Amino acid sequence: MEDEDCYEDWMSKMPSHMWDIPLWNLAIPGSHDSMTYCLDKQSSVSNSTPRVVQVLDKYFPCIVRPCIMKWATTQEGAISNQLDLGIRFLDLRIAHKIKDPDEVFYFAHGVYSLLTVKEALTEVVRWLDQHIKEVVIIALSNFEGMNLDQHKDLIQFLIATFNKKICPKSVTPSLQECWNHSYQVILSYDDESSTGYVELWPQCPYWWANKSDPNLVISYLEDQKNEGRPSQFFAAGLNLTEDARYVLCHPCQSLQSMTRRSYSLLMKWVKQQRPGSGQACLNIICADFVGIFGSESTQLVIGLNQIEA
């Protein structure tokens, strides 16, 4: 690909012999919990947090919320900046605030976001309009506090917003197929309410180690590879996960400092991976703080497509 330091149009610059490969057999960089760069410092904790945390937040918000922000924030760059870096998989955790009379949807990870779903996805549409040969996989999940009617409202908004850019789930999406039909968005919707919508793909499996030690994360991912990859889209998560004990034992740390310390080890593992249809091949590779060292991590993932297995 030309312009090796610029990845905002990397799909359009892929060599022609890769245009007909299904996207689930390519290496695609993704961001874990993509919208946590805009968490609301003034927000109460989300309803998905443990009950004890909700009680503590009620009486000691000045202590609880800064701590949650340190460990719930997984990204720094705005969604359009992530796309500019080459990210083509967005991990969106949707929520409706409890007792909120307005039918407004937010993102949640410990606390709620400042940006609404409408604002964020409108930004994605604007970006796609300027990069007409790029394809983004958007995985929506969690749906905290949502009932069936709210699911229907959200689904109708998604279809109206992305409209003809949506790639139907009946298609085997390659770059060429998407370009031929002007498809730019693959919507994965992890809820039974999506049944019957040709525009919505099923859940995108996410390999999550739930470990704070990067060596254990790598060990988990290797175990998953040995069991065999899914037949379609799936994501391997490089993200580290703290537990209550880790947070208490490391009061001066944050998720970002933990990620920085583990970055080189995780990237060394990425360099050894290969995309493709084989049992041990990877597809989407997700990371926290995707711009922490510029475009290096996305460059590594995209570069895997140029290596012959």
UniProtKB/Swiss-Prot annotation:
InterPro entries: PI-PLC_domain, PLC-like_Pdiesterase_TIM-brl, PLCXD1/2/3, PLipase_C_PInositol-sp_X_dom. One of its GO terms (biological process) is lipid metabolic process. Residues 17-193 form the PI-PLC X-box domain. Pfam families: PI-PLC-X. CDD domains: PI-PLCXD1c. It comes from the Eukaryota. One of its GO terms (molecular function) is phosphoric diester hydrolase activity. PROSITE patterns: PIPLC_X_DOMAIN. PANTHER family: PI-PLC X DOMAIN-CONTAINING PROTEIN 1, PTHR13593. This is PI-PLC X domain-containing protein 1. It comes from Danio rerio.
